Amino acid sequence: LMRALALEILRRKLSVTWWTNIRFEKSFSADLCLLLKASGCIAVSGGLEVASDRLLQLIDKGVTVEQVAKVTRNFTEAGIMVHAYLMYGYPTQTIQETVDSLEMVRQLFEVGVLQSGFWHQFAMTAHSPVGMYPEKFGVVKETETIGTFANNDINYVDKTGIDHDKFSFGLKKSLFNFMHGFCFDYKLQEWFDFKIPKTRIHPDFIANAIEEAEDFNIKPTAKIVWL
């Protein structure tokens, strides 16, 4: 759809500026990102969510952190800004996974493929997969009462017993600094006033991911567009 939109904008010789929400699909190749930029796309927002492959699979997001890194590289190299929706406190998420998620985010900003982001704490809604099948996610609903539209959050108990609230300030403070290009050399422990485990993520995980050459398979139906 976005490819078709970009081609139509160019065909009509329109002068527009646009920004959209996406999923970090692997179909966002370097060429497609250049086409989107030429049509007036200045930025995209997408859900990296918990920045953990296990939890992304549990959510059925359809992406991996490595794939997100490659796609954000393509957008950034095309001159399109990338904003990431980030999440913490997802059911079954461990303290280790929260720390590792922060490290993934730190690396994405450090290598320059992410320009903006915001941490959201997980909230259970009535008709989400967690709300409908809480037992699958290790949580217990405190009530079956469902509110009206846009007022359908449900209180729940996380069986892990982890207090995810306490991570809020450190996650947001670190992100604020990363967005401004500061403090990449800080140890993750410095963002929190309580003991956290060391990250298990390789320090060059994201750098190695974006250095891999893009799989340049041309489909028989591909078009050549001169920009």
What are these regions (language model features)?
Residues D31-L34, T92-Q107:
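Catalytic cores of alpha/beta
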Residues D153-L227:
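Radical SAM enzyme core and accessory elements
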